[in-house]
């Protein structure tokens, strides 16, 4: 439904963290995100379509010791309908990633020479780029983030270590010509905007809005009732998900879904809030089947087909 009902608005104030004086602003430019709302954004797949029809996602993720983040993001992207997945990783990760994600193609790079021509070529060809999941913050990772910001044509999704890298120089977010989506958890958001956790918790809605408008990026501020803010001031508050998702790796799954939807040429703001809704809906299915205690981020990926069945009306 358009806007937030009075009961839901009270829940938002209590659970999400919005100041009372901003409550009356919510109906005009803030909407709740329900699975039923996003279904019209997903057209039927073209019977004449091929893998190129559904986008080319480039992931620049993973590093020694953090291959799992890359694997989870990649599998989530593949379960979210992307046509081609290209993963740029250091040579050392190939023996781990190749058997874990057999559907992907790989662009291998030497960290001492990053980004390198192969990665730059992959950035040029991508319809969307996802950067940061398990990437680390070494000097070569900084160069990779800069290369994407300076050269990407399609939507750029920045998560995890990409945000930690940019915390020192958030003005770099103003560089890209392409749309940018950032997906910070509260700690990453505080590092980006220099505010305290107490300040953020006091008004999550305004925190996301101000950052989105200041840096012209779609801001996905994760948490209970994830807030998705556009540079225009338009805002969404997600209604799906549960505390069982509060485990390391859930954010990588969300990043993969977001990247996949962007690669399929969905409008960036719609892709951002749809991905959050789908991610939470998968989490709710997991909680029902496996319990909030026992569910894992990898279980979210396996529930994505059920969510897309609902979206397709089957």
Task: Locate predicted features.
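Proline/glycine-rich low-complexity loops and linkers
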Residues: 1-5
């Amino acid at each position: 439904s358009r806007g937030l009902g009075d009961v839901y608005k009270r829940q938002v104030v209590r659970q999400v963290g919005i100041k009372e004086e901003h409550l009356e602003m919510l109906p005009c430019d803030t909407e709740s995100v329900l699975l039923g709302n996003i279904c019209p954004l997903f057209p039927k797949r073209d019977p004449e379509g091929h893998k190129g029809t559904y986008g080319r996602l480039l992931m620049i993720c993973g590093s020694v010791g953090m291959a799992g983040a890359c694997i989870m993001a990649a599998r989530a992207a593949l379960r979210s309908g992307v046509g081609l997945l290209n993963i740029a990783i250091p040579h050392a990760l190939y023996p781990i990633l190749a058997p874990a994600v057999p559907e992907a193609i790989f662009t291998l790079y030497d960290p001492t020479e990053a980004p390198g021509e192969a990665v730059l070529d992959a950035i040029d060809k991508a319809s969307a780029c996802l950067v940061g999941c398990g990437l680390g913050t070494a000097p070569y990772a900084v160069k990779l983030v800069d290369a994407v910001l300076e050269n990407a044509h399609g939507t750029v999704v920045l998560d995890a270590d990409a945000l930690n890298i940019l915390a020192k120089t958030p003005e770099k977010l103003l560089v890209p010509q392409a749309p940018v989506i950032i997906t910070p958890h509260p700690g990453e958001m505080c590092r980006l905007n220099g505010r305290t956790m107490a300040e953020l918790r006091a008004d999550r809605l305004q925190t996301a809005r101000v950052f989105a408008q200041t840096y012209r990026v779609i801001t996905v501020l994760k948490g209970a009732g994830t807030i998705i803010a556009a540079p225009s001031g338009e805002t969404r508050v997600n209604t799906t998900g549960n505390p069982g998702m509060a485990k390391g790796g859930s954010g990588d799954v969300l990043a993969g879904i977001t990247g996949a939807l962007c690669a399929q040429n969905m409008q960036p703001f719609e892709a951002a809030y749809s991905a959050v809704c789908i991610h939470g809906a998968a989490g709710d299915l997991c909680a029902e089947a496996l319990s909030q205690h026992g569910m894992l981020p990898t279980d979210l990926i396996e529930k994505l087909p059920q969510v897309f069945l609902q979206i397709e009306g089957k």
